[in-house]
């Protein structure tokens, strides 16, 4: 075998390994589009907090231009949002001083959902963010996601003291067109 043939064989082997690695990160879930939080919702004619999967809403209404996210079967997450800004109050159209956000994936029914969180990511003054990493339940170890995430909800949240998940600002819209 010539050196050129060996080189071509190595390149093909490397490409094959890369494709296999990519196949292992196939998406479990995708989200395309987002809904900003409205802190109050009507229940039997009475305003109540708009709590989603046990997570309280931010104190004001928020809106989001664009939100896309992909969650891998291995717990990887990539989420990108644009224009997540306040939709009410004296500081309307701003990020209200928030400098970091994180994502929370909820799997299961509303009264018994399992929550998985991303690490905090930068949140710029235009309301843009890009979350990349691995979901966790304890803030340290990679989460083991269920093979199927029933009733999935993706929340973009504030970051509290010590990096703890805070209130929710926006929710992702599940993309049912995934393969």
PLM ranges: what are they?
Residues 1-8:
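Bacterial N-terminal signal peptides that target proteins for export
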Residues 9-17:
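Bacterial N-terminal signal peptides
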Residues 22-73, 176-179:
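N-terminal segment immediately downstream of the Sec signal-peptide cleavage site
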Residues 72-76, 108-111:
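A short, structured loop/turn motif at beta-sheet edges
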Residues 77-85:
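Short, well-ordered beta-strand segments enriched in hydrophobic/aromatic residues
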Residues 85-91:
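Extended, low-complexity, turn-rich repeat/linker tracts enriched in Gly/Pro/Ser/Thr and Asp/Glu
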Residues 92-101:
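Short coil-to-beta strand junction motifs in C2/discoidin
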Residues 111-179:
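Helix-rich interaction surfaces within compact, conserved domain-sized segments
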């Amino acid at each position: 075998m010539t050196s050129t043939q060996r080189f071509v064989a190595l390149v093909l082997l490397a490409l094959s390994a890369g494709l296999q690695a990519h196949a292992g990160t196939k998406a479990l879930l995708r989200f395309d589009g987002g809904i900003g939080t409205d802190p109050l919702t009507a229940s039997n004619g009475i305003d109540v907090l708009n709590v989603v999967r046990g997570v309280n809403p931010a104190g004001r209404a928020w809106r989001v231009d664009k939100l896309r996210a992909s969650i891998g079967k291995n717990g990887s997450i990539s989420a990108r949002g644009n224009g997540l800004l306040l939709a009410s109050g004296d500081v309307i159209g701003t990020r209200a001083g928030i400098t970091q956000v994180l994502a929370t994936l909820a799997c299961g029914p509303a009264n018994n959902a399992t929550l998985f969180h991303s690490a905090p990511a930068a949140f710029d003054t235009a309301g843009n963010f890009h979350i990349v990493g691995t979901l966790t339940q304890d803030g340290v170890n990679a989460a083991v996601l269920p093979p199927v995430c029933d009733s999935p909800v993706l929340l973009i949240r504030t970051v509290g003291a010590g990096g703890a998940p805070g209130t929710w600002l926006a929710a992702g819209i599940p993309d049912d067109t995934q393969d």
